[in-house]
Amino acid sequence: FISLILAFLVVLLVMPKAIPFLHQLKFGQEIREEGPQWHQVKSGTPTMGGIVILVAMIVSVLGAVVMGDLSTTQLSLLFLTLAYGVIGFIDDYIKVVKKRNLGLNSKQKLIGQIVVGLLFVWLSGGFTSEATYLSIPFTDFELDFGIVYPFVALFWLVGFSNAVNLTDG
């Protein structure tokens, strides 16, 4: 719980300073003219704000280390988030610094997400028979995916990552 509060406070304190700073650096994405008209108001909106979110996560994990409350699950989730964050950073970097509005193409992003997802599933034991259950919250029911679990987990990770990216953009 303390890690959650710590991450929230970091974002709350840093983001208001980061947005004008990113504006100063002209880290805004140009919006393509062929897009919807209502999307044009986003032109110049600073990109790379995800860096603040990643910093907040790192600070909260460091807080957990100080409190002696860090688990391997938290470390693997940190790896997953940072690795997906690196993909997002590369995408934004190409858009802003290289002035290529599309950033990484969809195939490059998908390959990166699949590689990261496979690493995460492997590191978290998803390829062992012990980690194939999905517990349904507030019930005693567990759904066993068996040998298809790694594929279900990978599909979920890549799908969730893209859903977050779509709603953010």
Describe these PLM feature segments.
Residues F1-G169:
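"…together with the soluble PPM/PP2C metallo-phosphatase catalytic core" -> "…together
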